[in-house]
Structures are given as structure tokens and as C-alpha cells.
């Protein structure tokens, strides 16, 4: 079995040697594109014994962020792989480390033939002396990535300007995607809040409408659910939570779903298709839905097999939208205790997942539901190390095409 590792570098001297060392543990060849680096990247590549092929762009070309668009760079790497014809390809960024708790070669050798690509967790390194516990106090910094796939002739890259998956756009023509426990990608970039803010500003200059980020706002995805103009609020919430100052939580109060692993399929805030006034949790069908807070059922709507329950308490409305997986029904005026079960989630159409749209409203409009939960000491994000893949296209097929008219 032959494993080819590939990466693309531009002034990556700070992290490149460690990345190459981590790839050399299990790969037979390492191919690299050096995109006009002016630091010690070229020297590192020349002296690393595991690097077997380097393509260099002319250093005197214009100093654009990348010489060629991301999709063209991926296409070049795929064509380089055609000359190696490996059994498996691993592609990483030059600031990713690969950590393994398994014999990766042995695992790949016994991977079923119908699995053609593998996902594993990526975690972000955090080293911010001013906000040392921002992770996990404000959320996790984990995601699933797909760095491994089988080589086939004719693989092609996605056509977006940026944020294409590393694996080929047509890889699923050859089989299905699996998960790879025991392997982690460690992202060495964006290890402080200031670096994340700079990255958001950079992406917004290139893609102000988030068209290349699956329609997801860059600030909400990189700043723990907060908007770029809410950084001061993020910092204030962090300091409150560090001091243990939380909003009151009723006896019995809990997350609306607590079966693990869960995932956030679609977050709160602006998206390319409009403003999303809640958060969509993906979970297993059959998962119970619980009332976060007590109140009275003030509205029940059913549309296309979905039920929308609104539980009102004082000046707060909490909305739960899901496809029921049981026959239980509430009626208008029912008094609901905090922690009471409201129903169970059914499967959503073509997806193997079920979804809960969770929304919080006050007299002033919609509020960030993740912040609402977290400021009561509840942690709605996926637990560390307990990531789940969301089936279906991304963003996932959600039952909630709700948009806010006023916010």
C-alpha cells in the first residue's frame, strides 16, 4: 500500500517542519506546492528527507494572496498525485499537524472497499494569554474534516474561489464516506482571539456575502457565534462566565436536547439566504426534546409534518420546531415545567438525522439562542471529542426555512 501526503505552502516556515514530520510517520511520499514563499519554506522543503516532489512558483510574480485560485491549486495537486498513483491520499494545510493514536497504515489496509474517503476531527490550538480559557468557556473549536481519500483516475477539484473540501468533488462517485477514529488534525493557526478577528476581516474582504462559505457568516463561525461588531459582548460574556456569574436557571432547566453526540447544523444570524433566527441542532431520530424553561403553551402550528411549539413565560417566548417522532401532543394553555419532555424528534426526509430548530424571542426581537443557553451555564455546543457528522448536504437539510421579518 502506498500513501501520498500533499500540502500547499506560502511562507509556512513557522509550522511547516512540524507538519511534514507528522506526515512522514505514515506516508511514503510527500508532494508540496511552494507558492512564492519568501521565508525559509524552500530551505525546509529542500532539507526534509520525506519530501519527494516540490513544485515552485516563480518568486518574482505579483504578491497576491495565492498565485492561482484555490480550486486550481487543488487541481494541480490532484494531477501531481496522478504521477504517483497511490492507494490513499492525505491532503492537509501547511499549518496542520496530524496526531495518531492508531496504526494508520493498518487501519487503511482493512478499510472496506466501498469507503472511499475518511473524515476525522480537527481541533484548534489555543494560546491566548489574555483569554486563556476562551475555549471551552465560549465554545469548542472542533470540526470534522476530510483529509483522506482513495486515489482514482479523473478526480477533480471543486470550483469555488475558496473553502473547497480537500477531497475531490467527485469522490462519492466511487463510494461512501466514513469516519476515522484515532486520528486528529491540530490546526496551529488562529490560536488567539485577535488572530481570529483578523481572519474574519480577511475573509470578509474576499467574500463579503459568504457565498463560498456555504452561506455561513464568517464572524459567527469563527467568533463562537458572535458577530464581528459584538466582540466586546463576547469578551464581557467570557469574563462573566469565568467569574461564575450566570443568569438564573430554573430547577429542572436543561438543554433542549441532551443526547450526545449532537451537532449544530445551522447557526443563528445572517446567512447568504437570509437571517436565521434560531439554531438548528442535528441529532439522532428518537431523541427527546425538553423544555429549557417553564411556561405556558401559547402557540402550536403544524406545517408539512413539522410542529412548532411556543412556550411563553413573562416577556420571553421559546420556540421549538421539529418533526415529531411520537404521538404525544400538547394543547394550547398547557402548563409546562422546566425540563419537561415536549416530544421526540423524527427523521428528516432524505437525511438520517433529526433536527430541532430552537429559537428565543423577547419583546425586542430574536436573541442569540446559543448565548441565551450558555449564559445560564448550559453548554449547547458539541462536547469536546464527541463530534458527529451531519448527514445530507451542508448546510444540512433542515426542516426550518424560517426567516425573521424583524430582528
From Swiss-Prot:
Stored Pfam families: Glyco_tranf_2_4, Peptidase_M23
Tree of life domain: Bacteria
Signal peptide (residue range): 1-27
GO molecular function: metalloendopeptidase activity
Disulfide bonds: none
Key word Acyltransferase present: no
Family annotation (CDD domains): M23_peptidase (cd12797)
Keyword annotations from UniProtKB, A to Z: Signal
Protein name: Uncharacterized protein MT3894
UniProt source species: Mycobacterium tuberculosis (strain CDC 1551 / Oshkosh)
Classification lineage: Bacteria, Bacillati, Actinomycetota, Actinomycetes, Mycobacteriales
